[in-house]
Amino acid sequence: MKKLSILAAFITGAIMVQAQIDSSAKNLSKFEKIPSFNMYIVPDSTSFSNKNLKTNKSLVIMFFSPDCEHCQKETRELLAYKNELKNIQILMASPSSYGMVKQFYEEYNLASMPNIKLGNDVNYALGSIYQLRTFPSIFVYDRTGKLAKAFVGNIGVPAILEALK
């Protein structure tokens, strides 16, 4: 079982090393609206889909890996800007195992931000819609559900807040 876990972690890491989102305007137009998705969120494996999102609220989708240093830094920054982000829905999705995602959730005390939903992107379904190659990758949607901005890499919360103005 331990060998299987190590193999799964290695495969996940290999997938994540294949970097870069194609951020050309032509390709970003595919993501103008929030796509349909379903994932299992921590801490209780509850199913969460695009139908569970609140309407008329901005949304930030952050694709991450628990072992990515840039993702860890971005997460610490989200926590530091807790008050500024309290009215923004944040969906953090990872292709890593549910156990790794749950450990990340607990380690960063993400329960302290109820507007964050963090979960396992089963079979990399949502990540493949966005054709992800880099973590973190961040997609910012305005209150109407239209894509405001897409970011690749650690960009900081001020850039996210600016995209929502």
Name each model-derived stretch:
Residues 1-25:
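Bacterial Sec-dependent N-terminal signal peptides
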Residues 35, 58-59, 135-136:
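Short loop/turn microsegments at loop-to-beta-strand junctions
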Residues 39-40, 63, 140:
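Hydrophobic beta-strand positions
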Residues 49-72, 78:
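Short active-site neighborhood of thiol/selenol oxidoreductases, capturing the structured segment around
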Residues 108-139:
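Short, internal strand/loop/helix patches
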Residues 134, 140-165:
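Thiol-/selenol-based redox modules, centered on thioredoxin-like
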